[in-house]
Amino acid sequence: PRAEFQDRPVLKGIDLKGHPLCWHTVTAQWLLDLSNEEILAAQLDRINREVSDFKGIVDIWDVINEAVIMPVFDKYDNGITRICKDLGRIRLIKKVFEATRQANPDAVLLINDFDTSEAYAILIEGCLEAGVRIDAIGIQSHMHQGYWGVEKTLRVLERFSRFNLPLHFTENTIVSGDIMPRHIVDLNDFQVSDWPSTPEGEERQAQETVTHYKTLFAHPLVESITWWNFVDGRWLNAPAGFLRRDYSPKPVYFEIDRLVNEEWRTGPHTLVTDDMGSVEISGYLGTYELRLKDKTISFRLDKGSTEEAITV
């Protein structure tokens, strides 16, 4: 699989992320034929295989997904819930994080969950106290039942900021059609054959998504925002994409493009150095190009960096 990815030009400059390494949903049926010890061994082998094989290509991983509900998940029997009940959540989390870290010591490792309540925060606290090295906290925000609003988003940010770890909003969706009924507890239970995007819904989606992105971008610990469906209908048939089913762009596509590539973009600027050859710039974090006559030099503005020496 590595050979299929590493030479693709489309991947240049794009950070790839693996999702997920351990999850109780969509597990192999044959795990049920194994003992708990064998299930755990198979899970750790799987982690070593994937993380080692894609090292240098995929260096960000959701190590374990939705562990808050994992030991009490009862929709159907599965091997991962079995070993989570046996070991307990924190012990299982520690084992899968250690296996991932061993396979790729330089990878960024996340815990990820849809549960944004205090239960998730308590689990994270327990993991950190047990010595689990979590690099970033993954927060899902599937808003099929309506936009959270700024107040709820800020409450979630406040709850998980207490750990002073980077926050990754890993799974973001806002629909551009009818809102899913509020009484649905598990989003996966809402299965419809037709869930169209509407003109009114598309305008609402664009406005709410811009507000959501701006709220997250303004927080100093938010490091990543991942939109879950680029094209409508890709998960639960929901109209949650930036593109319609025919791949035509919706208003949200143009609004986020404007936000990221215009409002949150620095330059171009023409600058003149002082007598010492220095110049001061203020800009958004990221990669820049310095053009001086016939030379082009790339450099980065990273969090905490104040000086960059460039030789031309």
Regions inferred by a protein language model and the residue ranges of each:
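Short, acidic/polar
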Residues: 1-2, 39-51, 117-127, 206-215
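A mature extracytoplasmic/lumenal domain signature
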Residues: 20-22, 113-115, 229-231, 294
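Aromatic- and acid-rich polysaccharide-binding/catalytic face
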Residues: 58, 65, 99-114, 120, ...
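Aromatic-rich peripheral "rim/lid" segments of glycoside hydrolase catalytic domains that contact
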Residues: 53, 62, 67-90, 95, ...
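Substrate-binding cleft and catalytic face of glycoside hydrolase catalytic domains
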Residues: 2-108, 114
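Short, electropositive alpha-helical surface patch
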Residues: 31-44, 75-76, 118-130, 134, ...
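Histidine-centered active-site/metal-ligand motif
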Residues: 19-20, 66, 142-144, 219
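Positions that flank functional sites
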Residues: 23-24, 142, 175, 231
